[in-house]
A protein has these predicted regions:
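Membrane-embedded transmembrane helical bundles of large multi-pass transporters/channels
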Residues: 1-35, 41, 134-377, 492-688
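Structured non-transmembrane domains adjacent to transmembrane bundles in polytopic membrane proteins
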Residues: 45-65, 70-159, 374, 380-542, ...
Length: 688
């Protein structure tokens, strides 16, 4: 370790040069990393609805679809518009009711339930399918091109809202970083003793962030959620590593003859402390990889990498920067304005039994509250209402009463009589307000011979045929999920290989998988962090007590939406607990490590807790404030509810964990001191 430390301090200029040069390939990697804006694509491939999507993509060459809404256009103008849409790159098929009826027949010739879904007043619908997937760049460019063909048209569907998501996410992501950096800078300016050090801290973390984002190229792609929150989370989580090294350097400067030797000692202490504590944080993020929804792998791996890069730059680049700019640091020194927190220590030492009583009463209550917090799964519900795709979807709902369209894939060779019977049964289900199939149209006098090949190819490829459905129920509701189950049962009674797919069924699978993921991720993160703490603290009881303390903070944070009567995005409900546990358990470890040191040295429990609080409260305060600052601004600024909620809850969680560790953790140490000393290694009998 000494050799490494000396290599860093003596080779500081080389390290700075290498780190800056590595920014070039990292920046190239960042620019070329594909971003996925379709959360549905993270569902497991073995889910039936994903198999349905796969059939659409491979067998029908329909990777995505959109609905074009025309207004006050004649039949001739609509057909001309269709021709223009067909010329757009990656568009596969285009069709409307006028391709079947032409100029001569009125829409009223169609079955009434179908007619009301394709024409309403002066508005008409055109169905467009794309060769590529919903979130593919080519599809998004095609949707954008179609929107620009005529000012009066609107484009609805998942591809349209995915484009909106991409555009708003890309327009805001730079502001997320700017806001996070600005707020962190304010906190650091106030809490550190030099006006220049904050710039070095942020510069060092900025390099680590670029490395992390650049290395995502090797993952193939990352989600827009990961892209939006990765930088601010990495900033908030790893900031205290750099602060720890800086404080150690300032201390050792008073104990050694020169600053190089002081930095050697600071790096050595930082490596021992930070590598140990960062392991719990990394483990917490990697617990997200247990999610069946592979978005968890996406976020977990990226954030675990971010922490690792943060540790690496803290023990290499940051010491080099501090040594090179030490004269400026000295010249810009000022008095820190961190408040005296000794009043917390005095309160806890005097009233720890009351604090613990609050904890014992609050733990089950907060658990109940968080278990009652509701999530929403409708991915468009969290988008701003002014977006063109959201507006178009609203037109479909309000004017055409198309709330949740989905479809059934059945054998193309199924007898037309059986298809009609099946469709009739489905029509009788509560909430179904439209079904459409070739067999149904044929029974109304519109034969296959009357249909253009493009229309027939959209719904029958010789191997599979598609039956379209429309439901009155909103996506991701219990009513729709129940309806889908009944539709599936009916369809499979006619064709055991039938598949019910589309946005509604996909969201139904999302609900089922998310509920499982929530349980798995939380239990895995707690288990992994617990095991690591067993080795770090060499104690059986302390990990239990500290995890309970942090879980209490998590329960409070997750229970607040229930108490406020609000719903949160389902992704937030899964990842918040793990992120908060992994990022803030270090607060509790920092305090308990000092407590163990004093107790194992022969000090009594009051002395140990008192010293531990003196040594850790200010560090916890600064670290939590930085974490809060890095995320709260994004939570307020973001117009995307998914990003806003995640960042708001993380920032709130940082403050709750800070208060929790400041009051609950030392109270637990005092009350369970005897248990701890008898279940931990390294204690002397005297004073135990």
């Amino acid at each position: 370790m000494k050799t490494f430390c000396k290599a860093v301090t003596r080779g500081r200029y080389v390290i700075i040069a290498i780190c800056l040069l590595l920014m070039i390939p990292a920046a190239i990697g960042y620019k070329n990393t594909k971003i996925n804006y379709d959360i549905v694509s993270y569902l497991p491939s073995d889910v039936e609805t994903m198999k349905g999507q796969d059939i659409l993509s491979k067998e029908f060459k329909q990777g995505a679809f959109a609905v074009v809404i025309t207004d006050n256009m004649s039949t001739k103008q609509i057909l001309n518009l269709e021709d223009r849409i067909k010329d757009v790159k990656t568009v596969n098929k285009v069709g409307s009711v006028y391709d079947i009826l032409g100029y001569s027949f009125p829409v009223q010739m169609l079955p009434s339930d179908i007619a009301s879904k394709v024409q309403k007043g002066d508005k008409n619908l055109i169905l467009v399918t794309f060769t590529n997937s919903t979130s593919d760049d080519a599809t998004l460019k095609a949707v954008e091109k179609i929107r620009g063909l005529k000012k009066s048209i609107q484009v609805a569907g998942m591809s349209a809202t995915t484009l909106d998501t991409a555009q708003i996410a890309n327009s805001e992501v730079i502001m997320y970083v700017i806001i996070a950096v600005a707020l962190c800078l304010i906190v650091l300016m106030l809490t550190l003793d030099s006006f220049f050090v904050p710039f070095l801290l942020l510069g060092n973390i900025g390099v680590a962030i670029v490395y992390n984002l650049g290395s995502n190229l090797f993952l193939g792609q990352i989600s827009y959620i990961t892209k939006a929150i990765a930088a601010v989370l990495q900033l908030g989580v790893t900031m205290d590593f750099s602060i720890f090294l800086y404080h150690k350097f300032e201390y050792w400067k008073t104990q050694r003859d020169n600053k190089l030797e002081a930095m050697d000692e600071a790096i050595a202490e930082t490596m021992i402390s930070v590598i140990g504590s960062s392991t719990t944080t990394i483990a917490g993020f990697l617990a997200l990889c247990t999610m069946k929804l592979t978005l968890g792998v996406d976020i977990g791996v990226v954030m675990a990498k971010g922490v690792a890069f943060g540790v690496l730059t803290v023990v290499t680049l940051f010491p080099a920067l501090v040594l090179v700019f030490d004269p400026i640091i000295t010249k810009t020194a000022h008095k820190s304005v961190v408040p005296d927190l000794s009043f917390i220590k005095r309160f806890v030492l005097k009233h720890y039994k009351i604090v613990l009583t609050v904890f014992v009463i609050g733990l089950p209550l907060s658990y109940y509250a968080q278990s009652r917090t509701q999530s929403y799964y409708n991915l468009t519900a969290g988008l701003p209402s002014y977006l063109p795709g959201v507006k178009a979807n609203d037109v479909l709902k309000k004017d055409f009463k198309i709330v949740s369209p989905y479809f059934i894939l059945v054998d193309s060779k199924m007898d037309a009589t059986d298809v009609k019977k099946m469709v009739d049964q489905i029509d009788d289900l509560k909430g179904i307000d439209m079904t459409a199939s070739i067999a149904k149209l044929s029974s109304q006098g519109i034969t296959e011979d009357m249909m253009p090949d493009d229309i027939k190819d959209m719904v029958d490829n010789g191997k599979y045929q598609i039956i379209l459905l429309s439901s009155k129920y909103d996506t991701a509701t219990d009513q729709l999920n129940s309806q889908i189950a009944h539709v599936s049962k009916i369809a499979k009674s006619y064709d055991k290989h039938a598949i019910v797919a589309g946005e509604g069924p996909l969201m139904r699978d999302m609900v089922t998988i998310a509920d499982t993921d929530f349980t798995n991720v939380n239990s895995t993160s707690i288990g992994v962090v617990f095991v690591i703490m067993l080795f770090v603290l060499k104690s059986i009881s302390l990990p239990v007590l500290l995890v309970l303390a942090i879980e209490f903070a998590i329960f409070i944070n997750m229970g607040i939406p229930f108490m406020m009567g609000t719903k949160i995005p389902f992704v937030a409900s899964i990842v918040i607990g793990t992120i908060q546990l992994g990022a803030t358990i270090d607060y509790a470890i920092l305090m308990s490590t000092k407590y163990l040191e004093i107790r194992q040295g022969g000090g009594d429990k009051v002395q140990a807790v008192s010293t531990a609080m003196d040594a850790s409260l200010q560090s916890i305060f600064v670290s939590a404030l930085c974490f809060f600052a890095a995320t709260v601004g994004v939570g307020i600024y973001s117009s995307m509810d998914m990003i806003s909620t995640i960042c708001s809850m993380i920032s709130r969680g940082a403050l709750i964990s800070m208060i929790d560790v400041a009051f609950i953790a030392p109270s637990l140490l005092l009350v369970f001191d005897k248990v701890i000393t008898h279940t931990s290694l390294g204690f002397k009998k005297k004073g135990a």
